[in-house]
């Protein structure tokens, strides 16, 4: 039986849909109290309705890369629940498809700010508010694209590779404070974010994977919940590939 997360409080950024929403549900199923974030108040309300967890789930609207939103979210969680034991950095953007050498500078800055620097900022706030004195667990969302290049997603993959390195560094630095930091690296998952890689082309997308299918949000969510829980109490600084065997192959075009 999975370790109980009763009395644990988690923040899941980007928790209104896809992997983030499935992660919130998995953490709730283990007994945790969860705060999800998202940019749209309507999507937050819909997600909370789907989670149907009453007072054990709240939502805070805002842009994940903005300091004011980060401060407001952590402050509300501390005020309402008294701790921040788990942080899941689930937010990521990919506004550019094409050659990395043609990546506009402003787009590159936006990607790194959201995909990498925001994760560090969320970590810092959670550490200052609670984890620095009490320990905790952080799970970052990377990508199988961090390990291999491709014709369209190279720039996105670079940010996700940086996420892996950030995970390792924070894990090393914060281990004495009993803060574990890990990451997951999914392949193509059937979410709106990755729709162009599977929607309307599901048979071909599935064929790219040795296990014969693209991923589901729950595949990733359950791994995140495991890493966040005491079941993984002696695991830190690791990145778990959740990719249906894709990284065992030489295929790169379908990495998401």
Residue ranges and their predicted role:
Residues 128, 172-173, 233:
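Alpha-helical segment proximal to the catalytic Tyr-Lys
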Residues 123, 159, 167:
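Active-site helix of classical SDR
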Residues 143:
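Residue(s) in the substrate-gating loop at a strand-loop-helix junction
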Residues 94-97, 225, 236-256:
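Short C-terminal tail/terminal secondary-structure segment
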Residues 71, 94-109, 132, 152-155, ...:
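Conserved mid-core segment of classical short-chain dehydrogenase/reductases
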Residues 16-18:
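Conserved glycine-rich cofactor-binding loop
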Residues 175, 180, 235-237:
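Short, small/polar-rich loop/turn modules that mediate ligand/substrate recognition or access, typified
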Residues 101-120, 139, 163, 211:
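Catalytic Tyr-X3-Lys loop
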């Amino acid at each position: 039986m999975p370790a109980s997360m009763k009395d644990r409080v988690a923040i899941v950024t980007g928790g209104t849909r896809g992997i983030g929403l499935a992660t919130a549900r998995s953490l709730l199923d283990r007994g945790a109290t969860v705060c999800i974030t998202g940019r749209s108040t309507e999507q937050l309300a819909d997600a909370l309705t789907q989670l149907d967890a009453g007072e054990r789930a709240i939502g805070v609207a805002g842009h994940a890369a903005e300091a004011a939103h980060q401060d407001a979210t952590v402050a509300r969680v501390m005020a309402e629940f008294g701790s921040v034991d788990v942080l899941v950095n689930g937010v990521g953007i990919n506004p550019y498809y094409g050659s990395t050498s043609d990546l506009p500078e402003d787009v590159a800055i936006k990607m790194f700010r959201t995909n990498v620097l925001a994760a560090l900022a969320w970590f810092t706030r959670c550490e200052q508010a609670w984890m620095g004195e009490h320990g905790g667990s952080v799970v970052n969302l990377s990508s199988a694209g961090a390990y291999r290049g491709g014709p369209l997603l190279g720039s996105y993959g670079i940010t996700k590779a940086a996420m892996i390195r950030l995970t390792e560094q924070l894990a090393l630095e914060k281990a004495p404070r009993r803060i574990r930091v890990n990451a997951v690296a999914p392949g193509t998952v059937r979410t709106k974010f990755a729709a162009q890689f599977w929607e309307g082309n599901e048979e071909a997308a599935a064929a790219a994977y040795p296990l014969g299918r693209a991923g589901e949000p729950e595949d990733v969510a359950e791994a995140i919940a495991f890493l966040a829980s005491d079941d993984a109490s002696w695991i830190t600084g690791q990145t778990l590939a959740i990719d249906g065997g894709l990284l065992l192959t030489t295929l790169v075009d379908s990495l998401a």
